[in-house]
């Protein structure tokens, strides 16, 4: 029953995504993918590399959108530099970029970026619900940021760069 409540609260959190700058639909997409992943790991229903992964030892709460974190992430995205920012003050961070020979837009970027980070679990799985340096360096660093149980606040920024032929997405995470 508790797992059902967590899954329902994850879906509810999506409807409360209030963006401060990026399109609200993209903020909702970021939260939807993050919270779906978190709910399935919490419930023990997540499948990676063809096997059902163990449930989290404690319930994983859904993430909520944070406008101050969005503002911080947007400042990083505005640099158009694909590199982790310095001085994040206890914020986790994920980066995503996409190039094209044609102009790109923000449409669908919340889902595309989040899906690409979550795919690390699909590609590499994990051996233990407790993150170790070995586990982190196995290629799941972005996905673990999405699933980190103590992180409950999310904010993302996006910037079109290089004549609108590249988009840089930055998401930052804060512990409760």
Region locations from a protein language model:
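Mature extracellular or exoplasmic CAP/SCP-family domains and secreted bioactive peptides
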Residues: 3, 14-176
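Classical eukaryotic N-terminal signal peptides for Sec-dependent ER targeting/secretion
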Residues: 1-10
């Amino acid at each position: 029953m508790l797992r059902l409540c967590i899954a329902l609260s994850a879906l509810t959190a999506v409807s409360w995504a209030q963006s401060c700058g990026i399109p609200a639909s993209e903020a909702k997409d970021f939260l939807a993918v993050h919270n779906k992943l978190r709910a399935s790991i919490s419930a023990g229903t997540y499948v990676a590399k063809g096997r059902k992964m163990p449930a989290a030892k404690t319930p994983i709460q859904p993430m909520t959108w944070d406008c101050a974190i969005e503002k911080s992430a947007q400042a990083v995205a505005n640099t158009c530099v694909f590199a982790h920012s310095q001085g994040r003050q206890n914020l986790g961070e994920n980066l995503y970029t996409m190039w094209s020979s044609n102009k790109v837009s923000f449409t669908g970027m919340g889902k595309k970026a989040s899906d690409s980070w979550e795919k690390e679990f699909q590609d590499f799985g994990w051996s233990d619900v407790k993150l170790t340096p070995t586990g982190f360096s196995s290629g799941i660093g972005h996905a673990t940021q999405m699933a980190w149980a103590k992180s409950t606040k999310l904010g993302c920024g996006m910037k079109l760069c290089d004549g609108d032929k590249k988009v840089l997405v930055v998401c930052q995470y804060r512990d409760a």
